[in-house]
C-alpha cells in the first residue's frame, strides 16, 4: 500500500485558501448585517414621509410594504446573472468581480434610497403616488445584495445550509438594529434630513469597504474608486439642504404649494411630525390638528366647543382630556369656573415644545391645576382603573386615519365610561 503525501506548497495553498474563505465569510456576515440596517432604516424614513403626505391614510403602509417587497423580490431575481458558479475555491479575481458587483448594487441602492423622500416632496406638488416606484427601485437594488452576498461568501460544501442560516441571522440582526436605532433613537434626536444624510454616509462607507477589498492590489483603480465614493458622500452632504428644503411644506400643501409657502415650526420625534403654519394652525402627521387660539372673536379652531363643557356639566371639578394638541381646549377648560384639576394624556411630547412658544396657551404648562402625562390614552386608563372624573374630553382626529379606532372603538368608549 502506498500513500501520497501532500507537498509543502500544496499545504500552503490550501491554508491560504482556507484563510481567504474565512475572511470572505466574515465579510459576508458584516455585509448582510449592514445591508439590513440600511434597508430597514430607509424604509422607516420613507414611511414617515408617506404617512405625512397622506394624512396617515391606513392604506399607505400596506402600499409602501407591497412596493418594497416587490422590489426586493425583483432585485433578488435580477441578481441571478451575477451569481455564476465559482467553484470550491474561488480565485482572488473571482472575489474582486463579486465585490465590484456588490459595490455597484449598494451604491445605486443607497443613492436612490437617499432621494426617495426629497423626490416624494417634488412629486407631491403634482401627484405623489409615482414615488412608490422609487421605493420599489431602491428596494430592488438592495434586494439583490443579500443573494450576491450569500453567493460571494458561502462555499458550496456540506456546511452551506448552516452558513446561509447565519447570513440570514446577521441580516435580521442588522434589520432589527436599524428599526430600533433609527425608529426609537435617531428620530428622537435628528430631523428627517439628518437621518437621511446619515444613512447615505453609512451606505457610502459600505461601498468604500467593498471597493477597497475589490481593488486593494490595484493602487490606481483603488484610488479612483475611493475618490469617487468620497466625492459622492460629500455631494450628498452638500446637496441635502437643498434636496430637503421645504420638504414638509410640499408634503402638506401638495398641489397648492408655492415657493412662498412656509411652516413656522416643525417638530420631529419618534412619535411623528407636527407642523405649524403662519396662521397658527397645527398639523399632526399631516392632518389638521387645531390651532393656537382661545378667543371666540377669531374662532379659527371652533373653540366654542370647549366653552360648551360648562353647559354640559353643572360643576365639572375633575376633568380628563385624551389628547393635548395645541393646548387651546385644555387652556379654556382648565380656567372654567369650578374646575379643580385637569389631567391630560398626550402621547407626543412635541406638542408641549410648541405650546411654550405661544402666549395664548403657554401658561397651561405652569398651571398648578393641570397635570400633563406623556402616555398612550388606552394604556393610562387601563393602569388607572380607580381614577374617576366628572368630564372626559376627546377632540379626536378624522375617523378614517390609521389607528383612529384606538380612540373611536366601542371598546375604548366602554373603557373611558368606566372612569
PLM feature segments, named:
Residues 1-419:
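Alpha-helical transmembrane segments of multi-pass membrane proteins
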